[in-house]
Amino acid sequence: MKKVLLISFVILSVAAQMTHAQKQAVIKLTEKTLMHEMRATPYPLDKAVVNDRAVSFQWPLRSDMNSQDSPLDGFEHKVKKVDKTKVTYRLRYSQDAGLKSGVVQVETRWPFYNPEQPLTPGVWYWQFGYVEDGQVTWGSTQQVTVEDRPGKFCPPSLKTVLAKLPADHPRVWIMKNEWKDFINHSKQKAERQWYLERADQVLQTPMKSVKDINVSQVKNLKNEMQINSYLTRESRRIIDAEEGNTEALIRAWLLTQDTKYADEAIKRVFIMADWDKDKNVKGDFNASSLLSLCSMAYDSFYDRLNTSQKKALLEAIKNKGGEMYENFNNRMENHIADNHVWQMTLRILTMASFSVYGDLPEANTWVDYCYNVWLARFPGLNKDGGWHNGDSYFTVNTRTLVEVPYYYSKLTGYDFFSDPWYQGNIMYTIFQQPPFSKSAGNGSSHQNVGRPNSIRIGYLDALARLTGNTYAADFVRRTL
């Protein structure tokens, strides 16, 4: 009888504990959304502890600028206009809770700030403020505890980066002082021949033009949304193909210094430079593709261009880059995930900015923005390494995820791949789709991904080489 009572008591106790645990596990959602589309809270949050990276201060936009609307392709002109040249913020921080002594105060044109030197370990207090008509409206005081630990990610300031930027050209896809060694070293690589074969095919291929854009269905469409969507798709067919062809010629020139590739690429770039002025060319991808070609031509062929050609390219870069920066400025940095930006357009503006820095005054601002917004927000918009935007589109981002930190690492000597996000992202990339497996299912079109594609494998191969991660290397070995 005692044994029965004891067993009954144990069962009741366990049941009670399970019920209590289940009650504790219930999370009630009270917000309208799981996350804010535009930043609604300062970062770091009050009482936060930061120990994995240098602190980046970030805060919400002014209420009159805090639009959640990211312009659709072809509808950029519909976005509410604010004179962003007059937008400024103040930030102050100190280890004094009253912000009376040892205060660092800065003014910034964007709602984020990366201190030039990492904050020393300890408790810090900070405030942001909106500046309007010379008056500052301060937010509440936030507290953040900074801890130190081995391997903490503390990239250099922009001042350090620019001090190491070469004055000559090329300096983006290849550094001029390394060019000859690069050519000689590339002769041992199989990939070199792939690029040259593609470029040789391009030399034999007549260019298409904007007149080849298929507009046959426009007459059957009912509204501006349908027309712009259709023209965006059809114009991309032409521009994507011609961008790929011309980029192949530029790469072949950098691999060989053979003038036949340079001359043909220069001719094609100047034909395409004004294509974005055509009424049938729509969308930010098309605009960024043309900016990429103009800036890569300027940097790669600098010593072959005459004065008027350089001037024309700088003017094109100024106009295209200016429009792109205007779209980013005081919007993108607070948007949770503007996919086109992460996939392509920020990378292109970054490379364009560094290609003309020192030659185009506007590039001073672009370089500042691109570099510091990368430190503040990138590479993954989170800390765990997962690509929460959706796995099917993950591989569209791989050029940005590799090329931008690689370029910064090359310039500075600091390893941008030491960002702890990359080690987490390697695990995500592997476990989201193991060798010879379908995607685990996250985001649109994941059901169409039947096995790891070449881009996913190539991305892990690049990270294995750049970080020494043996899991990534093993994944590549097993899937090839």
What kind of region is each of these model predictions?
Residues 442-480:
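N-terminal leader/propeptide and maturation segments of large enzyme subunits in energy/redox metabolism
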Residues 69-121:
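Recognizes extended acidic, P/S/T-rich segments that occur
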Residues 195, 227-438, 445-446:
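Aromatic-lined, polymer-binding surfaces characteristic
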Residues 144-174:
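Low-complexity, Pro/Ser/Thr- and charge-rich linker/hinge segments at domain boundaries
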Residues 23-77, 145-147:
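Pro/Thr/Ser/Gly-rich low-complexity, intrinsically disordered linker/stalk tracts
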Residues 131-149:
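Extracellular fibronectin type III
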Residues 1-23:
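Bacterial Sec-dependent N-terminal signal peptides
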